[in-house]
A protein has these predicted regions:
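Extracytoplasmic beta-rich repeat domains
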Residues: 1-13, 41-64, 89-104, 148-155
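Short coil/turn segments that connect the beta-strands within blades of beta-propeller domains
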Residues: 16-18, 64-65, 109-111
Length: 155
């Protein structure tokens, strides 16, 4: 599943007899839970600027007919759980400014919630950047809200 030297720590997601996994090379897979046979594989995005990805990938989420996964370069994907086809892809944080992900999304009250790592690395001169948690519409990937976890000037 993973050819890179980065840590591979996915928490499997099992739904209706299918096992879903993601790895540090941003490859999302669906396996038959009984036989282990590969059902589909989606290469979401190649790891960006860092050989072998940017660290461990830990979890993905499912809601209705989609699997949700964030890649190591801070893109959030909605993927059709049955076919493995990408339905939507949104940039949550700019990886060029230090954002990335090692923990995936969760779904709460019909919203896909995603935090970022890299708050300690983002470029301080960028006034629009900071530490945040975001919520997205599971059907479209549209940003619903963003909450700054560290108050910025004026907040």
């Amino acid at each position: 599943m993973n050819d890179s030297a980065a840590a591979n720590e996915p928490t499997p997601l099992i739904h209706d007899g299918v096992l879903y996994l993601i790895n540090t090379d941003n490859i999302l897979q669906a396996l038959d839970g009984r036989t282990g046979d590969l059902i589909w594989e989606n290469h979401l995005r190649p790891p960006k600027n860092v050989p072998g990805g940017t660290g461990a990938m830990r979890n993905i989420a499912i809601y209705q007919d989609k699997i949700f996964a964030e890649t190591t370069d801070a893109h959030l994907f909605g993927v059709n759980a049955r076919t493995g086809q990408t339905v939507w892809d949104v940039m949550v944080g700019d990886s060029a400014k230090g954002y990335g992900s090692s923990s995936g999304p969760i779904v709460i009250r019909g919203k896909v919630i995603q935090g970022e790592n890299g708050c300690d690395r983002y470029k301080a001169q960028e006034k629009d950047q900071g530490c945040f948690i975001s919520a997205f519409d599971p059907a479209t990937g549209k940003l619903l809200w963003r909450f700054n976890t560290i108050a910025r000037a004026g907040e």
